[in-house]
Amino acid sequence: MDILKRGNESDKFTKIETESTTIPNDSDRSGSLIRRMKDSFKQSNLHVIPEDLENSEQTEQEKIQWKLASQPYQKVLSQRHLTMIAIGGTLGTGLFIGLGYSLASGPAALLIGFLLVGTSMFCVVQSAAELSCQFPVSGSYATHVSRFIDESVGFTVATNYALAWLISFPSELIGCALTISYWNQTVNPAVWVAIFYVFIMVLNLFGVRGFAETEFALSIIKVIAIFIFIIIGIVLIAGGGPNSTGYIGAKYWHDPGAFAKPVFKNLCNTFVSAAFSFGGSELVLLTSTESKNISAISRAAKGTFWRIAIFYITTVVIIGCLVPYNDPRLLSGSNSEDVSASPFVIALSNTGSMGAKVSNFMNVVILVAVVSVCNSCVYASSRLIQALGASGQLPSVCSYMDRKGRPLVGIGISGAFGLLGFLVASKKEDEVFTWLFALCSISSFFTWFCICMSQIRFRMALKAQGRSNDEIAYKSILGVYGGILGCVLNALLIAGEIYVSAAPVGSPSSAEAFFEYCLSIPIMIVVYFAHRFYRRDWKHFYIKRSEIDLDTGCSVENLELFKAQKEAEEQLIASKPFYYKIYRFWC
């Protein structure tokens, strides 16, 4: 029996199994609360693999995609969760503090760098959204690479991407401790690491709902803080506020200037900080398997444009007008969570007596941002580990899912990495994390490149197999050209980072300086060939377009019904005023 292709009886079975993951286990209801809690950690009995799956005539990739599409996640995320995760989920220390390191390269270099990375990020999110809405499988875009490009490339992307989140977790825990130390330096930072570690781990044991509700609340705080800063910043630029010396405008763009010298090298230097600021913007697409409605994913992806335009570009312009790039405080921070190096604090503290109050306020915002990133680290890494286990690229124990849809082994591995946060008590902490981050430093650009390439390959496969673009659940606003632009931009960003690593700004070239930023390149090459050697496949370095699986796990089960619904929706939008049409296009 063909158990994987669209339109057959087993597809109905797959749909029933996937949808039933939100139904509680009846056998647990009669027990005590403690027993129900205990039993909830047992392996899910809802994820049933058909006995004839392994014996079917389908390809190995089709079998893997079926498994990824039928993982027993709970579909509980609503539109409000996804909207706030998309808007505020990536507003972290990269923006609130890391922006200062980029500003030291000049306001024009900062703006150009953020525009380039922001454009790249918009292309990436649109490409990932198209694939995630079409194939809402475990691991999302990280596993789509294996489906549309090559399994070894997919393994390299997924492992490096997961490693980046795993390493970020203990680093952000240390950030929580150091942020608290701004108010109280008498308590050992390791105590604060322990408190936040327990809080984050317990929070993730509440499942995806605990993650989503926490992110919803924290994102609101961050968004409000950004809006407050934008309003105050505009007033200060116009010459308002206490201790005002008059209209500022673009004063600092002329003196000390728009670019620090050397211009090109400083421009390339902004790419790293910009990538750090935008990193995780694609996280909302990872929730596709736990979302109530796929359309909520597409709407959240459309909001990326406004998030980039308002929260990043507008903020960058205001910061560039309020703080000169040669302000020594920009590079005076003792660590990546030092509030004194925040350009937000520097800009507002120039108002005089407000300085101390502003520092306290921004420290609260930064603490909220760091806790939010910690939460995202455990969520993202645990889901990626589970997907790698389900696809057979990691030991099968990694795919363990309990009855509440929690990837417990993935959460446990994240927790194990979190223990590295106690290195805050060591004098070698900075050096250790410098080299840990070097393991995945450039992997963000590589991951983004592969996401865009996956969308291009998806469109090419549709054409090669005589299929129409009309069956795409959500089409990227930029189409396939957005994927092409994303690939080009990310390739240029990788080249720029390699260049500035080989010839760093303000210091001589050295192997140590180069590998601090580019160690991930040889690491990825080794991982790629190690996986290919393990598979013993040296004949096929990419999947042929005609052989790409376009059916397994596809959200469009009834093509004719889907087309009718799309046509009705288009007719409804066509009957609305022009402003509504614009709203639906961008939101």
From Swiss-Prot:
Where are residues bearing Phosphoserine located in the sequence?
10, 27, 44
Q: Which residues form the signal peptide?
A: none
The chain's Extracellular topological domains, given as residue ranges, are 104-109, 184-186, 241-266, 324-360, 428-431, 497-509
Task: From the Swiss-Prot or TrEMBL record, state where the protein is found.
Answer: Membrane; Endoplasmic reticulum
Which residues fall in a compositionally biased region of kind Basic and acidic residues?
A: 1-18
Q: Which PROSITE patterns match?
A: AMINO_ACID_PERMEASE_1
Q: Which GO terms describe its cellular component?
A: endoplasmic reticulum; membrane; plasma membrane
Q: Which Pfam families match?
A: AA_permease (PF00324)
* GO terms for MF: amino acid transmembrane transporter activity; putrescine transmembrane transporter activity; S-adenosyl-L-methionine transmembrane transporter activity; spermidine transmembrane transporter activity
List the carbohydrate attachment sites: 184, 243
Per the record, ranges on the Cytoplasmic side are: 1-80, 130-162, 208-219, 288-302, 382-406, 453-475, 531-587
Misc. comment: Present with 1300 molecules/cell in log phase SD medium.
What the protein does comes down to: High-affinity S-adenosylmethionine permease, required for utilization of S-adenosylmethionine as a sulfur source.
Q: What gene, per UniProt, encodes this protein?
A: SAM3
| Protein name, per record | S-adenosylmethionine permease SAM3
One GO term under biological process is:
S-adenosyl-L-methionine transport
Q: Which organism is it from?
A: Saccharomyces cerevisiae (strain ATCC 204508 / S288c)
So which domain of life are we looking at?
A: Eukaryota
UniProt lists the family membership as follows:
Belongs to the amino acid-polyamine-organocation (APC) superfamily. YAT (TC 2.A.3.10) family.
